[in-house]
Amino acid sequence: MPLELVTVPCLSDNYAFLVHDAASGETAVVDVPEAGPVMAALAERNWRLTQILLTHHHGDHVAGVAALREATGARVAGAAADAHRLPPLDLALAEGDRVRIGSEDGTVLEVPGHTVGHIAFHFADSGLAFTGDSLMAMGCGRLFEGTPRMMWQSLRKLSALPADTLICSGHEYTQANARFACTLEPENPVLIFRVGSIAAARKEGRPTVPSQLSDEIATNPFLRAGEAALKAAVGMADAEDAEVFAEIRRRKDNF
């Protein structure tokens, strides 16, 4: 049976994710921007929290960890490389390590760029990838610590996951990201269609996260930096893919 996913809005535009295994009763949360909404979502479902999985060290992803750990006794797992600036870890993780929820193993992927110690969690059997602020719906995280080439390689790693994977990213930035994408390719019909779908979802108050990887591959400019059409759109037809990515990221930073 696939893991059950609940998207929990936090702060002004963050998301935490509850991941529940019905057979065992185990529940994990991925990132804890604040404890209150996560505890409310657990109580509403009468779920028992057993694990806290962290993608990176930024405060808007870990601020609620201490309170949630104290309330539930859940074990905390995060990147070994960032152990010195994460809340105290019970389990320090690196590329290829496994985390288990019930009977399903998830694989740890190192995806530096937004931060140098950023990790993602891929639960292949349930088709879920928790990407934090690396790959995001219609976008990617700012490069606060890593280089453009580093982030491009991380995005390529994530884009190689199965196309029907649900990308569970950390923020509701999708509509702004879509507006930026339209400045690059204002006449791209696939992009225009997705922009309309995003606008409709937000008008109805629905989250646009998670998104499907196939949609990101088709419309997310940060995943498409290697495509001839997008290279031409930014005037870099003969440039290396990582250089095109860097230019797209520069433009987004100034958008």
Swiss-Prot record:
It catalyses: an S-(2-hydroxyacyl)glutathione + H2O = a 2-hydroxy carboxylate + glutathione + H(+). Its cofactor is Zn(2+). GO terms for biological process: methylglyoxal catabolic process to D-lactate via S-lactoyl-glutathione. Disulfide bonds: none annotated. It comes from the Bacteria. One of its GO terms (molecular function) is metal ion binding. This is Hydroxyacylglutathione hydrolase. The gene is gloB.
